[in-house]
Every structure is written in C-alpha cells, then in structure tokens.
C-alpha cells in the first residue's frame, strides 16, 4: 500500500480481526484511480515504535511476516491470499512464535477477515441512533449543530406550467 490516504481508508472502513500476534484490518479490493482491475492482496505492514523499540526488531518482524505470507502453504489458505487491501499491525509476539504457528495464525485471520469485510462508508458513526436518514423522512435538528435538512419532492420543486393549471 502506498500513502497515508490508503492506510486511512482501510483503518476507517476495514473490518478488524484481532489475534495475540497482530491486528488485521481489511477491506475489499478496489483498484487505484487509473489502475486496471487486477484483484490481488495488497497488505501494508505496520510496526510502531511503542510496540517494538529497536529498529532491528521492527525490521525483523516485518521480514518474518512478509516471508510467512510469501511462503504460505496451500493447505493453510486454499485459493491463495484473498483479494483485499489490508493493514497488519504487528505485536512483539511475532518475533518469538514458531514460523508454522505464525503462518497458521495469518491464514486463519485472513479467512475470518475475508468474510467480514465492510462495504461502503461509515454509516453508523456520527452519534445519532438509528443510522442514516430513511428515504422520505425529514431530518430534524437532532445534533444541535444548527443545520436542518429539508425534504425535497422533485415533482413539486418546479412551478407548474400554464398548461398544467387548466
């Protein structure tokens, strides 16, 4: 993954799968602007300085996970890696766990996450109960922000023509 914007989108809209070794956030695959449709797994690895203090350990953790994904046995993940955009936030346990266990944990998380990806925007967020506005309802001033949305009926929006009045 490239750029803060892609990471922000996955963090905001991605489904989370937690494991003692890492946290996986993933969304459905969508090509970048101007890119051809080529479904594949695009995974960004994140290791914070708070999690692993030394750069050598952070780099070793990244290399271990990258190699575990690259050499994933087909029996662990039939069909290969799912087409998705994902962020793997690594924990210190990645350095000490045996390699086959790391691969098994990654495969299990990817399988769980592939079925749980969220689609669309963040509709449930914003503080109002009940989610978004239902078609035909008028949104009141529930948030206290001073903004009111009014219902617009497309048939009554334009004045009646002289032919319709008679």
Curated annotation (Swiss-Prot):
Q: Which UniProt keywords apply?
A: Endonuclease, Hydrolase, Nuclease, RNA-binding, tRNA processing
Q: What class of enzyme is it?
A: hydrolase
Q: Name one GO molecular function term.
A: tRNA binding
* Compositional bias annotation for Polar residues: 142-159
Got a GO cellular component term for this one?
Answer: ribonuclease P complex
Catalytic reactions of this protein: Endonucleolytic cleavage of RNA, removing 5'-extranucleotides from tRNA precursor
Database matches in Gene3D superfamilies: 3.30.230.10
| UniProt GO BP | tRNA 3'-end processing; tRNA 5'-leader removal
The EC designation for this entry is 3.1.26.5
Entry annotated with the keyword Hydrolase: yes
Superkingdom of the source species = Bacteria
UniProt-annotated stretches for the region Disordered: 115-166
What is this protein's function per UniProt?
RNaseP catalyzes the removal of the 5'-leader sequence from pre-tRNA to produce the mature 5'-terminus. It can also cleave other RNA substrates such as 4.5S RNA. The protein component plays an auxiliary but essential role in vivo by binding to the 5'-leader sequence and broadening the substrate specificity of the ribozyme.
Complex formation: Consists of a catalytic RNA component (M1 or rnpB) and a protein subunit.
Q: Please give the family membership noted in the entry.
A: Belongs to the RnpA family.
Name the UniProt record assigns to this protein: Ribonuclease P protein component
Which organism's genome codes for this protein? Deinococcus radiodurans (strain ATCC 13939 / DSM 20539 / JCM 16871 / CCUG 27074 / LMG 4051 / NBRC 15346 / NCIMB 9279 / VKM B-1422 / R1)
Q: What is the lineage of its organism?
A: Bacteria, Thermotogati, Deinococcota, Deinococci, Deinococcales
Q: Gene name on record?
A: rnpA
């Amino acid at each position: 993954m490239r750029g803060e914007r892609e990471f922000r989108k996955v963090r905001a809209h991605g489904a989370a799968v937690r494991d003692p070794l890492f946290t996986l956030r993933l969304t459905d695959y969508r090509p970048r602007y101007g890119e051809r449709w080529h479904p594949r797994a695009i995974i960004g690895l994140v290791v914070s300085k708070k999690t692993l203090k030394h750069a050598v350990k952070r780099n070793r953790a990244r290399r271990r996970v990258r190699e575990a994904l690259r050499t994933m046995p087909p029996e662990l993940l039939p069909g290969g890696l799912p087409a998705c955009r994902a962020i793997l936030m690594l924990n210190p346990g990645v350095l000490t766990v045996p390699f086959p266990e790391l691969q098994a944990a990654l495969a299990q998380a990817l399988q769980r996450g592939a079925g749980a990806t969220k689609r669309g925007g963040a509709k449930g967020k914003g503080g109002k109960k009940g989610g978004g506005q239902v078609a035909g309802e008028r949104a009141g001033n529930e948030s206290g922000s001073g903004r009111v949305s009014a219902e617009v009926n497309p048939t009554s929006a334009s004045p009646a023509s002289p032919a319709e009045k008679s």
